[in-house]
Amino acid sequence: MDVQPVESYGNGARASWVLFVRVLTSATLLSLAGIYTLFPTTTAHAEYYVGGYGGLSYPGAFSNVTLSDPTVAGGVSGARVNDLELKSALVGGVKAGYFFISRPWLGLETDVFTLKPDVKQQVVVGGTADGRVFAGTLPSIPLRLTTWAANLIIRSPSMSEVFQPYGGIGYALFIANSSQAGESNIHLSHGFNLFAGARYVLTPNWALFGEFKFNRATLNFSEIRGNYSTQIFVFGLMWHFDK
């Protein structure tokens, strides 16, 4: 998957943050608008819900990496290096969606969550296009990763009125906000979101839920490009409007 950077800023951390907020707000509003317009003949009978959650992410190795960094091994550009280690991180997010009364097992959902899987300081070994082999220390790189996903969700409401397992898949937009040597930059990448979980109904409107997510994308940030994947475990509280 070819990932194109949106824009890179020198010392424009403020401008980067403004762009980040605009993109995130636009994505959320568009997805919520879709909930009300995709199925105009049936939305009056839909079961709507919103929820918030928190948890932990456990990223896998950042693989198939190319790196450009003037501080590593005297300076390298477009070098292939070994897999990089990312930090585990706290996760926070919100979601909204609906299920149809006519098809209570099927729904659409929008999900936005954020985490900070910084690149650890580590020794990297690699090679350049001209055949030079090198080893050097890569400094820690701060990374804020926000994901917006548009999901198709399937549940099993007939199994139990109280316990409802579910699962689904969705298209995901990954917003990587990183900084290196005092410079801040934002890049957008495309990927997917797989998830499975269960809801435990407390009242006709309130439910607890636990969920596992698997994310995968090709990210490009701070002159680093590679394949990102992570496993995420979250717990949260959900409100159903039309129960």
Task: Label every model-predicted segment.
Residues 1-47, 242-243:
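Cleavable N-terminal export/targeting peptides
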Residues 40-100, 232-243:
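Short glycine/proline- and aromatic-enriched beta-strand/turn motifs that initiate or cap beta-hairpins
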Residues 62-69, 119-127, 177-185, 220-227:
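Outer-membrane beta-barrel translocator domains and adjoining extracellular loop/strand segments
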Residues 63, 80, 112-113, 117, ...:
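Predominantly the C-terminal beta-signal and adjacent terminal strand-loop region
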